[in-house]
Design a protein with these regions (language model features):
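Bacterial N-terminal signal peptides
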Residues: 11-21
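Bacterial N-terminal signal peptides that target proteins for export
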Residues: 2-11
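Charged, low-complexity intrinsically disordered terminal segments
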Residues: 23-196, 200-606
């Protein structure tokens, strides 16, 4: 061994020892924490009745009606599509108070802000009156506070939390640990639980795109999501949700809090630990929280706003990938397989809404096959613009393949950051300050924009097939959802639900809310040369240097009615507004160009 190599070998050995120690649970601390939790946990409940003092709810009557009408051959369910963020949070709080026996939750993100803490408070209240509450939260961006988790571990026996796929058996991942995990355990680190499920008594379930953070519920003062959830009521699909949740709950990567080294060490160290939670990390608008609490207790209001408008439907299926998605056959990719089947058999129209328009090679082949059919279906896509997205790296990859998607026949509409209909899409939009109180998880950053105010970004994930079948869930229809994350969603076979979701998406793609993406008009030989070079550059597997694109964004002229991008009068009625309208800083445009040029190899993981 050369002497000069010795320091490097010692450093490498030290890193290996560090990684090995981080990759195991401290079993002694875990045993001590288990003993302390068993001794400290409160087990008393405030209610001894058979329904644990559940609040009366109009949804109980809908559940009874659905269960009475369901037969062995014909299931019956009731459905409420939840378009507005605050109403989706209101529904969760109301159902938590109406829970009689159990509440089961899966989520990808849980931030300790107004919305996240309100939900925790309500779940704790349910546990204290006798309801069994179970939460599975993906570790990467959920409850990133070991002190809070150590309190939650002992606060009540009926509240049980597990953290999915923790990095190095810890609740909080530091930057160096984040990098080390990518280097040592890339495949496992990237397999995240992206499911969103809120299940009450095994028969009332909310599924969709929303996590637990202010921006998902119209409560962020700088950036809010345009998202979609759906409440489905009935025992038939309830059994499917329960079965899926149990698979995740019992999976080896769902870790009890005492199996997290930064949590169990705190449990053992804090001998005088109380049974109250520490203050929330982020508190923006306590008055708004209090108002929502009042509304959630008003059964008449919940009946008037939601239950009376619930749609009676027949078949509803809940699909979820299996937790061991990466460990076996394609049969573990349950939701992705079902989506592929639905699209492949579309006859007349596909309406797709996704925050990230980056589709897999397999999906591209399916759409190519559809394009070649004699009676090909129309494909309408609603997605984010660069100015609206909070993931500009992913947008840059979409930008690379925009011509390819247009050639597949997609009509693409990119959501504006300040849609004209924002006051109807976002609760109390006019009252939000446009300040900078946002905190917690942000994926890859937002592009600075030219307009001041509360920005809105698309986060809904839905497909409507042939105006009869609707998928609402967590799947982004991208390679990460296909290959790494576990995803879940409802597939609803009902024309009224399809009409409601289609109407919502058509509003999102209306000219006042979205830009239309269309090819640049072919005017001369230079344009054709540019097109040829652009095709060659975009076809390169890793690099794409050509800055001049086949397509750009268009705004409707005031004197015209909306037209599809393939209409012969389109260019008379629309004005090109550039590739990245309303993006302020040239530097962000440069970053986007760089990722477009070099980022193709990251499509599968971004």
């Amino acid at each position: 061994m050369k002497v000069q190599n010795l320091p490097y070998r010692l450093v490498l050995l030290a890193l290996c020892v560090l990684l090995c120690s981080a990759c195991s649970v401290n079993r002694q601390l875990a045993r001590q924490a288990d003993q302390l939790v068993a001794r400290k946990q409160v087990s008393e409940v405030s209610c001894s009745g058979p329904q644990n003092c559940a609040m009366a709810s109009p949804f109980h009557a809908l559940l009874d009606e659905a269960n009475r009408a369901t037969s062995a051959t014909q299931p019956i369910h009731f459905v409420n599509v939840l378009e507005q963020g605050e109403e989706s949070l209101l529904m969760r709080i109301h159902l938590a108070r109406a829970a009689r026996h159990s509440i089961d939750i899966q989520t990808f993100i849980w931030v300790d802000d107004d919305a996240g803490r309100l939900m925790l408070d309500e779940l704790l209240a349910a546990a204290r009156r006798g309801v069994k509450v179970r939460i599975i939260a993906d570790q990467l961006f959920s409850l990133e506070d070991a002190e809070l988790l150590s309190r939650l571990a002992v606060i009540h026996r009926n509240l049980d939390i597990r953290i999915y796929n923790p990095t190095f058996h810890k609740a909080v991942t530091k930057p160096l640990e984040f990098a080390a995990s990518i280097l040592c355990c890339f495949k496992r680190f990237n397999q995240r639980m992206h499911n969103k499920l809120f299940l009450v008594d095994g028969e009332l379930g909310i599924v969709g795109g929303r996590n637990y953070q202010n921006r998902y519920f119209d409560w962020d003062h700088s950036f809010d999501y345009r998202d979609r959830d759906v409440l489905v009521i009935g025992k038939d699909v309830g059994a499917q949700m329960t079965r899926s949740f149990e698979q995740f709950w019992n999976y080896k990567r769902s870790a009890r809090l005492t199996r997290l080294n930064d949590v169990n060490s705190r449990i053992v160290a804090e001998t005088d630990q109380g049974h109250d939670l520490p203050p929330a990390q982020i508190s923006v608008d306590p008055a708004r929280v209090d108002r929502l609490r009042v509304h959630a207790s008003d059964a008449d209001e919940m009946d008037r706003r939601f239950a009376r408008h619930a749609l009676r439907v027949g078949q509803v299926d809940y699909f979820s990938d299996l937790p061991h998605k990466l460990e076996g056959s394609a049969n573990n990719h349950v939701l992705g397989e079902r989506i592929a089947h639905m699209i492949r058999h579309a006859q007349s129209r596909i309406v797709l809404q996704t925050p990230y328009l980056v589709i897999s090679k397999r999906a591209q082949k399916i759409f190519r096959d559809l394009r070649e059919r004699e009676n090909r279906p129309q494909v309408i896509v609603s997605t984010n613009s660069l100015a609206a997205t909070d993931a500009f790296y992913v947008y840059a990859l979409s930008h690379k393949y925009k011509k390819r998607y247009l050639k597949l026949g997609f009509w693409i509409y990119e959501f504006k950051p300040f849609p004209e209909d924002a006051p109807e899409l976002i609760a109390d939009y006019a009252l939000l300050s446009g300040g900078t109180d946002s905190a917690g998880y942000q994926r890859y950053g937002q592009a600075p924009v030219t307009t001041q105010g509360v920005r809105v970004g698309m986060h809904a994930k839905s497909i409507v097939i042939d105006d009869t079948i609707t998928l609402i869930g967590s799947h982004n229809f991208d390679p990460r959802s296909d290959n790494y994350n576990t995803e879940s969603g409802f597939i609803i076979y009902d024309k009224a639900v399809s009409a409601a979701v289609t109407a919502a998406i058509e509003r999102d793609i209306a000219p006042q809310n979205s830009w239309t993406i269309a090819k640049r008009p072919r005017t001369n030989l230079i344009h054709r040369f540019n097109n040829a070079i652009g095709d060659f550059s975009a076809a390169l597997p890793l690099f794409d240097f050509w800055p001049f694109r086949f397509a750009t964004s268009y705004e409707l002229n005031d004197e015209c009615a909306p037209l599809p991008p393939n209409h012969p009068d389109f260019y008379d009625c629309y004005t090109a507004v550039g590739d990245f309208p309303e993006v302020d800083l040239p530097l962000k445009t440069i970053y986007t160009r760089i990722v477009t040029a070099f980022g193709a190899g990251a499509v599968g993981i971004l």
